[in-house]
Design a protein with these regions (language model features):
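Membrane-proximal basic amphipathic "stem/tether" segments
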Residues: 3-4, 11, 218-267
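Short, flexible, basic/aromatic active-site loop/helix in glycosyltransferases
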Residues: 126-142
Length: 267
């Protein structure tokens, strides 16, 4: 019987359907004892075996609208949300994750992130007295809300998703959007990376470590769908990272104020 408190929710779309067979193969290899239902939310059913459930929302929606539909269909109060390119690279510590889920409930957390990204600092986080292995992100700081791997309170996640369209807007605007009730509830982050995944794709192109992971696990991948990023793309991304690191808070607030930054493309 699957855990009744949490669902693993994988967010995808038709453009990234080629990532799903490797995703689920690695997931089942490295987390064969996963106690949670594995649900996929996407546009069209990709016909990939290995998911316990597929929520096909149809064409014409956005990343956020599909997320809202999925959360309305899911009956558990929490989700462990993953993107479709979060490929497992070694075995998951199930006992550790179950302990983190219990902490979500115990501390009434909005989110418990299992990778310290953005890196916790004295400016964006606080010590969490109840558990020294955790820190608490300061609300209304850049990317205190982010789609890095973690447990989410479904009601909080749905409220934010209902107000935005793209994954990037969800993170940027959501980091500054909290109700009075949510103000007293923590956003927690582990000091170490506790979910052993790699981000296999960036800006629609394979990362070299993503391809290496597939080759090492003898998994097929379709290079006709996406290749490695060009030099110009890598240079552009490096410049953007450099600018962002100069003052993350200022850059994010300017993006929100003037509707800058990445936007979702339909079709």
């Amino acid at each position: 019987m699957k855990n009744v408190d949490c669902t693993v929710l994988v967010a995808s779309c038709d453009k990234y359907a080629d990532l799903l067979a490797p995703f689920v193969a690695l997931f089942r290899k490295y987390w064969s004892a996963c106690p949670f239902q594995l649900a996929l939310v996407t546009e069209s059913d990709p016909g990939v075996e290995g998911f316990d459930r597929t929520i096909a929302c149809g064409k014409g929606g956005t990343w956020c609208s599909r997320l809202v539909q999925a959360l309305d269909a899911i009956e558990t109060p929490y989700v462990l949300m993953l993107c479709d390119d979060y490929y497992l690279e070694r075995a998951v510590d199930t006992a550790l994750l179950l302990r983190r889920l219990e902490q979500m409930k115990k501390y009434s957390a909005l989110n418990l992130r299992m990778i310290p990204n953005p890196e916790p600092s004295e400016k964006n986080s606080l010590a969490f007295a109840a558990d020294g292995s955790l820190r608490e992100y300061v609300k209304r700081t850049a990317y205190c809300v982010a789609t890095q791997t973690g447990f989410w309170d479904c009601a909080f996640l749905r409220r934010l998703a209902a107000k935005t369209a793209s994954i990037w807007e969800f993170e940027r605007y959501g980091s500054y959007d909290f109700t009075d009730e949510e103000e007293s509830r923590p956003i927690l982050v582990t000091r170490e990376k506790e979910f052993p995944f790699l981000d296999a794709v960036h800006k629609g192109a394979w990362e070299t470590w993503g391809v290496k992971c597939l080759k090492e696990n003898k998994l097929d991948f379709d290079f006709s769908k996406r290749g490695l990023p060009s030099f110009s793309t890598r240079l552009k991304e490096a410049v953007k990272r450099f600018i962002w690191k100069l003052n993350p808070e200022l850059v994010t607030r300017l993006q929100n104020r003037f509707a800058l930054g990445a936007k979702e493309r339909k079709g």
